[in-house]
Curated annotation (Swiss-Prot):
Annotated GO biological process: histidyl-tRNA aminoacylation
NCBIfam families in the cross-refs: hisS
Species the sequence originates in: Borrelia garinii subsp. bavariensis (strain ATCC BAA-2496 / DSM 23469 / PBi) (Borreliella bavariensis)
Protein name as it appears in the record: Histidine--tRNA ligase
Gene name as annotated: hisS
Secretion signal span: none
Known partners and oligomeric status: Homodimer.
Gene3D superfamilies recorded: Anticodon-binding domain, Bira Bifunctional Protein, Domain 2
Native organism taxonomy: Bacteria, Pseudomonadati, Spirochaetota, Spirochaetia, Spirochaetales
Amino acid sequence: MDVKTLKGFKDYLPKDSLIRIHIVKQIFSVLNSYNFDLIDTPVLEYSELLLKKSGDESEKQIYRFKDHGGRDVSMRFDLTIPFARFVATNISDLKFPFRRSQFGKVFRGENSQKGRYREFMQFDFDIVGEDGFRADAEILSVVYYGLEEIFLNFIEGINKKFIIHYSHLGILNSFFEKLGIKEESIFILRNIDKIDKIGIDKVKEALLLKIEKEAVDSILSLVNLQGAFKDKIQALKSILGDNESVKRVEDVYRHLSLLKIQDSFNLNLKISGGLDYYTGIVFESEVFGSNMGSVCSGGRYDNLVSSYSSSIQKVSGVGGSFGVDRIKDIIDLEQFSYIKIFVTKARSKVLIVNLDSALQNYYYELATRFRNHDYSKVKNISCEVYFKNKNGKNIKEQIEYALNKEIRFLVFVGQEEYKENKIKVRDLTKKEELLLSFEEVINVIKCNEKLLCTPF
């Protein structure tokens, strides 16, 4: 029997899972600060629903089959289309504007490689029921603060590790209309989106199959606008005149400037979202030096929800998706090893060393006190008792176990400590050992949470 995993699918060992949880927790903390509400949707949906707005590329990659009841079903390839179905299904129970967050696995039958899998986790966030520019800007600010939290850019001395590219499909569509080729807009956008992947020459070659050379040259010149934001806006105004989409981009930029985060954003007209349901702002996020593609992308989709129900009026939406597993692969790169140090040191885990067979019950009572010392459960300490007791003759074995699990604190209680109601605690990162009361041990562990601010 072949016991290896399928191509594009993988197991996650504890250390890998720890990094994934770090990513999810950091994103969740940001979304929670913005009042996003967590939801969930099924992994399986009717194929007709998923294929309706997926685009040709996604249709080729979808896992589709007949279930035991003969129904044509597919595994979700993203979380956005199932969310649009969710809104259409539950619209009477939702209060708009609705801020949604959701994380879960999605499935795509694409060529697997580093940073690209057939099963992977996404963390999505959306605002539906609001079509103003501030909703666009708020989504972009979530991307910024989410990546800042993940890559610890809030710590002094750690430089920004990412750039967020954004565009507006209305700008491109206005230009196509001016050139008299609006009917080919989907074809053009799909190819423009591939410029950074396959190169401008191959994209030009593909565009020339349907578009005149003069128009192709004009398009490629537009999407390669260079300079500062104000220079690009000035160029767009000279080409398109008074244009609503250009004004929208200006308004979004002003909002980002209000937050003093505008320097992490780049107006990049090569970005088109890659999916047919986008209608306005679109964005992708790049981590410097990773060469793994976008780690968070999304955009505005004003017609998606209403396409699933004839009784629903237009429900505007804008959102994005963090690629949890791709971000995890980037953190595996050597230049991001500081994050692993941070995550490991931030875990105040305890191992109670099993020294004395006569103190077995006490050890488990003590472990319960560590786990439950904080009534809110928020700041409780992860703790376990080493199972095997050899009356102190296997201490080396227990320390090796702690090191392997990256447990930071060892607790020793022998007969002498027990009689004095004291605990001996050893910090494995400092090779430091102290004899303390239970309350003092808690304080020592909690004081070491300062490492959350200085992980080195």
